[in-house]
Amino acid sequence: MTQIIPALDLIDGEVVRLVKGDYKQKKVYKYNPLKKFKEYEKAGAKELHLVDLTGAKDPSKRQLVLIEKLAKEVSVNLQVGGGIRSKEEVKALLDCGVKRVVIGSMAIKDATLCLEILKKFGSEAIVLALDTILKEDYVVAVNAWQEASDKKLMEVLDFYSNKGLKHILCTDISKDGTMQGVNVRLYKLIHEIFPKICIQASGGVASLKDLENLKGICSGVIVGKALLDGVFSVEEGIRCLQNA
């Protein structure tokens, strides 16, 4: 069953949205993050997604106090990402009550450390964020999307799927924050080649039609801007995924 996963991006406790990961293209929403997450939970969301953009820029400023409060106050699963670079950071987040930790660039830059983390904390606790951009082939971008690596997406998935990886969060970064619609072709391709991997789709969700198109392909669809801007509600998203 494909789930809608409402998402909040936080900078210094404020709810924001960036366009294509650019801190200069920042929109601040006057929402209290806890109230917003509780609203999403009440509406029927079973999982919530949080990006700690402050911690992504500076790990020493990770918003752990707020994250712990959010994890304690909501009764559904919370997953957190944002520039996580070490085993200690993963442990700190899990100790806060976070259900899953999202790790990204590390998977490309330090596979040994990434595999150690997968082994230590287990495949249910780790989500690999693979931000991808289409060159001649889909390649993985690193460092908050500022550079494309030479690693092909399918090769990275092949490597980690053989090492016990279960959850991925895949973002087509040409779409993120643009509300231009999702890249269904990309997710279908991953699902066909790696049917046992649970795919969370992210980037560009602009309508209920996007959710419909991803039903049965992805385990979850991360929705940020469309919910914050009132394009559709969590309830409508759930109904759409149940009926599509």
UniProtKB/Swiss-Prot annotation:
Location of the active site: 9, 131
Catalytic reaction annotation: 1-(5-phospho-beta-D-ribosyl)-5-[(5-phospho-beta-D-ribosylamino)methylideneamino]imidazole-4-carboxamide = 5-[(5-phospho-1-deoxy-D-ribulos-1-ylimino)methylamino]-1-(5-phospho-beta-D-ribosyl)imidazole-4-carboxamide
GO molecular function: 1-(5-phosphoribosyl)-5-[(5-phosphoribosylamino)methylideneamino]imidazole-4-carboxamide isomerase activity
Recorded superkingdom: Bacteria
Example of a GO biological process term: L-histidine biosynthetic process
Subcellular location: Cytoplasm
Keywords: Amino-acid biosynthesis, Cytoplasm, Histidine biosynthesis, Isomerase
Major site of localization recorded for this protein: cytoplasm
EC number from the UniProt entry: 5.3.1.16
Pathways per UniProt: Amino-acid biosynthesis; L-histidine biosynthesis; L-histidine from 5-phospho-alpha-D-ribose 1-diphosphate: step 4/9
CDD domains xrefs: HisA
Recorded family membership: Belongs to the HisA/HisF family.
The name this protein goes by in its record: 1-(5-phosphoribosyl)-5-[(5-phosphoribosylamino)methylideneamino] imidazole-4-carboxamide isomerase
Source organism: Campylobacter jejuni subsp. doylei (strain ATCC BAA-1458 / RM4099 / 269.97)
Lineage: Bacteria, Pseudomonadati, Campylobacterota, Epsilonproteobacteria, Campylobacterales
Name of the gene: hisA
